[in-house]
From Swiss-Prot:
Function description: The small GTPases Rab are key regulators of intracellular membrane trafficking, from the formation of transport vesicles to their fusion with membranes. Rabs cycle between an inactive GDP-bound form and an active GTP-bound form that is able to recruit to membranes different set of downstream effectors directly responsible for vesicle formation, movement, tethering and fusion. RAB25 regulates epithelial cell differentiation, proliferation and survival, thereby playing key roles in tumorigenesis.
EC category name: hydrolase
Pfam families to which the protein is assigned, alphabetical: Ras (PF00071)
CDD domains in alphabetical order: Rab11_like (cd01868)
PROSITE patterns (UniProt xref): RAB
Motif (Switch 1): 35-49
Name of the protein in its database record: Ras-related protein Rab-25
Organism of this sequence: Mus musculus
Cofactor: Mg(2+)
Length: 213
């Protein structure tokens, strides 16, 4: 998957980062979009997003990655944050089990506000701190499988699997968009919701993908 300028693209995919404060969402965002990492743990209050345009086959896709930037501390995330999102990374800190214990609540909130067809990846961040691990890979992988989520462990610090996590989500979104585009001749608008929202997914629509590298 190559890079393109942000001015030249065929699709825009909104992807949201959710999870408890301090799990590394902002650094995952900056690592993917700017290849940067900040050791400063101060929390920025507000909603922010960054973009990066990538190639999926012959299509240029502008990934618009949204970060809660601390609002999760105050339960202040609104439905507007989720509106229009076609992908989500649900992030927990694999060295703090309490951040994993609440992923089910985050998942419920996501599904309460987003389209039913949204692509979701569970992300166990801070894999570089393996000796401090509190969440076994197998446990998180099983949760992902049981809930039809993708799953990866990442390290925003040393870049492990960060690129793969975002690429995998974007490819899953693109596959759904392409399928919907082929099945629809009535409109040129591309979303993952509309007629599909609220319906039970068909065979193969929700599939888990536990990736261990």
């Amino acid at each position: 998957m190559g890079n393109r300028t942000d001015e030249d693209y065929n699709f825009v995919f909104k992807v949201v980062l959710i999870g408890e404060s301090g799990v590394g969402k902002t650094n995952l965002l900056s690592r993917f979009t700017r290849n940067e990492f900040s050791h400063d743990s101060r929390t920025t209050i507000g909603v922010e997003f960054s973009t990066r345009t990538v190639m999926l086959g012959t299509a240029a896709v502008k990934a618009q990655i949204w970060d809660t930037a601390g609002l999760e501390r105050y339960r202040a995330i609104t439905s507007a944050y989720y509106r229009g999102a076609v992908g989500a990374l649900l992030v927990f800190d694999l060295t703090k089990h309490q951040t994993y214990a609440v992923v089910e609540r985050w998942l419920k909130e996501l599904y309460d506000h987003a389209e039913a067809t949204i692509v979701v990846m569970l992300v166990g961040n801070k894999s570089d701190l393996s000796q401090a691990r509190e969440v076994p890979t197998e446990e998180a992988c099983m949760f992902a499988e049981n809930n039809g989520l993708l799953f990866l462990e990442t390290s925003a610090l040393d870049s492990t699997n960060v690129e793969l996590a975002f690429q995998t989500v974007l490819k899953e979104i693109f596959a759904k968009v392409s399928k919907q585009k082929q099945n629809s001749t009535r409109t040129s608008a591309i979303t993952l919701g509309n007629a599909q929202a609220g319906q039970d997914p068909g065979p193969g629509e929700k599939r888990a993908c536990c990736i261990s590298l």
